[in-house]
Amino acid sequence: MLATMLAVGCSAWVIRAEETPPNLVGLLTVRGQCLKVSIARDDLTGRCTGELGMAVYADGRTGFHFMMRSRHIFTVSGIHSKQQSNAVQVDRIVLNDGLETNKPEVIAAEGSCTYGDPYRGRMTVRCAGKLGRLQDFVASFETDGTPPTE
């Protein structure tokens, strides 16, 4: 399980599943490479598959889904910034082990993501922040420049 693999130990910051945003309005998949995916000292970059999902919800929430081996997904999620059109204010990380029998683990976070337009060629998603006071996280992905699939 990805949550165990990460050994984050942040059960105090877990957000209830009923707080998950409804109303998906858009989902794109882009190809490229993970530049970095890590929590604290756990570097997960080598487990990335080269695919990134980008989800947009009706309430302004955006999720960047870093696809990992063994069907695991590392998601950085937050509300679209009102000050910057290409930024997201991160408020949670979602760890999904890919098994239908297990619910994803949602962990409160603080940070931000910036991104470019995937329809205009190569672009980079860069996310960074903290889980609680002690755990840093970083997640970045560079697309290969091909148009996204919807």
Q: Where are these predicted regions, by residue range?
A:
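A short, surface-exposed beta-strand/turn
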Residues: 78-84, 137-150
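Bacterial N-terminal signal peptides
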Residues: 2-9
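Acidic, glycine-rich flexible loop segments
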Residues: 88-139
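Sec/Tat signal peptide C-region and signal peptidase I cleavage site
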Residues: 13-17
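Residue-level signal for mature regions of secreted extracellular proteins and peptides
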Residues: 3, 27-28, 41-42, 106, ...
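An ectodomain-focused feature that recognizes extracytoplasmic/extracellular
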Residues: 18-89
